[in-house]
Amino acid sequence: MESGGGSLGLHTSDARMAHTMIMQDFVAGMAGTAHIDGDHIVVSVPEAVLVSDVVTDDGITLDHGLAAEVVHGPDIITETDVVTEGVIVPEAVLEADVAIEEDLEEDDGDHILTSELITETVRVPEQVFVADLVSGPDGHLEHVVQDCVSGVDSPTMVSEEVLVTNSDTETVIQAGGGVPGSTVTIKTEEDDDDDVKSTSEDYLMISLDDVGEKLEHMGNTPLKIASDGSQEDVKEDAFGSEVIKVYIFKAEAEDDVEIGGTEIVTESEYSSGHSVAGVLDQSRMQREKMVYMAVKDSSQEQDDIRDERRVSRRYEECQAPGNTFDSALENRNTTAAQYLQICDSMNTNKVLKQKIKKRRRGETRQWQTAVIIGPDGQPLTVYPCHICTKKFKSRGFLKRHMKNHPDHLMRKKYQCTDCDFTTNKKVSFHNHLESHKLINKVDKTHEFTEYTRRYREASPLSSNKLILRDKEPKMHKCKYCDYETAEQGLLNRHLLAVHSKSFPHVCVECGKGFRHPSELKKHMRTHTGEKPYQCQYCAFRCADQSNLKTHIKSKHGSNLPYKCEHCPQAFGDERELQRHLDLFQGHKTHQCPHCDHKSTNSSDLKRHIISVHTKDFPHKCEVCDKGFHRPSELKKHSDIHKGRKIHQCRHCDFKTSDPFILSGHILSVHTKDQSLKCKRCKRGFRQQNELKKHMKTHTGRKIYQCEYCEYSTTDASGFKRHVISIHTKDYPHRCEFCKKGFRRPSEKKQHIMRHHKETLM
């Protein structure tokens, strides 16, 4: 392009037909004027319709119709110098080699002007088109040409069609790059009454259109958007995710809009001219969806009210409900770039206060929450991270997110004031305090003499305090040393860890140790409830023989002052003697039919008959057919067949479901009191029959020989079981692997699972 002498010449390359157009002659033919303003040529012509075709030697063809034809030519980047309002031009566009400005002053007329300039050999760097805003007074029209710049050298020109309405400003955006044209008109209207001012403030208006453009309102006048409904609502971005059109508006003073309310214009209404006109008349341009949102942090409510006048607006990006975060880009919404507008006006504060008052009284306030009014008008509660201010829709997501802050997780809730011990468990903290008491037993009184002692608990969003009162807890003392603790479980572990060597016979239930097996056997009765010792004078029963002697001596001794006339019993109290006489003289109305035993009620008599005189065991085991007197005994026995071996020997890998069997195992295998030794293998035994049975293994003779097969053994009980289970008809269910017989199929199945499980697998 060359400029000089007040003329503008357009020249083609040497390989093409030369086309020359004198601008002054062209303008004069249109009854217009042209002048030079600095580096630009300003052309003014009456408002008309101009269509540019391919220029030949015949000249220029004019058509006063309203249609625009497309002429192929290189893309031109256009820059507009704005007179009335400021225009933001991206820096990338300023690097273009060519910029053309046209200032068209209109006369009175209703036509539309479309101008095109044809050029050749114009090479500009590939850039992105820019949208400029041009405004002017009434009766004056200014036009902006926008094209998508590319590096194509072929002569291509895209003509544009501009629709003019009775508005002050307008901008036309033509999508390039092969995308079907979608015209979005941004229209601003001023109020008729200048005295009436909107009480709402201006907020950033974000629109995600088909090509991802961002339009920003620069003035103080509210914006209305009318979008072409022919385009798809959902597109895909560079990451393959869906991009949704989102428009966020501020509410105007005359709009009766509720926070969280939405307004949707259907496609049918959009295609109807009356519906669109009605929306325009009501100062509401059509849009697919308008969302009024507000976010409020309850902890910042008072600060927002105090800073309300100097803080006009604030924006935060938040995840929409139902969307997920990418693992690498946690703060990015892969579905759409949605923004929430935070309104700090007094009206919004009132709405948020009403929402907060409806909160349940019993709800904990340990977690900070933010109230979000969603698109459906319902309040949504999110949980913000107090470290990075991210928000989550549940406490579980917040806890999972807190793992990204390892420095915070390293902090412990409880810290000892006497040392550097820290922990997150309250029980461990108390146990640690007790360790200080054991170490500094001299200072035991000083440990709890203070009225209160406070330990700070640092929670993620609040601070609580743990108060220890001066009341001493109940202490459990070890009978073998000076150890004491407030928990029985700690004492049991202490006995196992410290005193297990001195007291090898340890109870599997409570961990208490004993020196002799008889002591352990006597102690086990306290857990099972067995009372084998019964008083011969009364119904008293006990688990220890010494307790029975004490009872007889104290209740039935010969030196007691009150003696019974009917029996040799004596009592130390007259009331006890009278109670005995009442029972003896006829209050025991339930007489046992088998003996002289009498009971005061039928249940006691039934228990006596079952336990003493009945050889029948009504409660039978379904697996081994063993009978029991009571259902509780049967239930305890059934655990053996269920395979729940919860009792394990602490000396070896032996496990059993019966604590008595475990005690017998410990006594027979792991006790040091094994005085009977085998002379050949030096193995010890507690009883003579066990040693005698063991000695048979060294003779080499199988004294028990089966007469039906080649089976032989030194164990009489084993030989008896062999004959009954293998060679009798009482066991019809035979094992397929060892030919052992069983009475029931369940016994056979249990045998196979126990002895032939590897064969099955």
UniProtKB/Swiss-Prot annotation:
This is Zinc finger protein 711. Belongs to the krueppel C2H2-type zinc-finger protein family. Pfam families: zf-C2H2 (PF00096), Zfx_Zfy_act (PF04704). Transcription regulator required for brain development. Probably acts as a transcription factor that binds to the promoter of target genes and recruits PHF8 histone demethylase, leading to activated expression of genes involved in neuron development, such as KDM5C. May compete with transcription factor ARX for activation of expression of KDM5C. GO terms for biological process: positive regulation of DNA-templated transcription. InterPro entries: C2H2-ZF_domain, Transcrp_activ_Zfx/Zfy-dom, Znf_C2H2_sf, Znf_C2H2_type. It is found in: Nucleus. It comes from the Eukaryota. Keywords: DNA-binding, Isopeptide bond, Metal-binding, Nucleus, Repeat, Transcription, Transcription regulation, Ubl conjugation, Zinc, Zinc-finger. Zn(2+) binds at residues 564, 567, 580. Interacts with PHF8. The keyword Transmembrane helix does not apply. Its main location: nucleus. GO terms for cellular component: nucleus. A zinc finger (C2H2-type) spans 383-408, 414-436, 476-499, 505-527, 533-556, 562-584, 590-613, 619-641, 647-670, 676-698, 704-727, 733-755. The sixth zinc finger contains a Phe residue, Phe-584, instead of the final His residue normally found in C2H2-type zinc fingers. There is another His residue a few residues downstream, His-587, but this is not involved in coordinating zinc. Despite the His to Phe substitution, the zinc finger retains the ability to bind zinc using a tridentate metal-binding site of Cys-564, Cys-567 and His-580. The zinc finger also has hydrolytic activity against 4-nitrophenyl acetate. The keyword Iron does not apply. Disulfide bonds: none annotated. There is a cross-link at residues 224, 235, 296 (Glycyl lysine isopeptide (Lys-Gly) (interchain with G-Cter in SUMO2)). GO terms for molecular function: sequence-specific DNA binding; zinc ion binding.
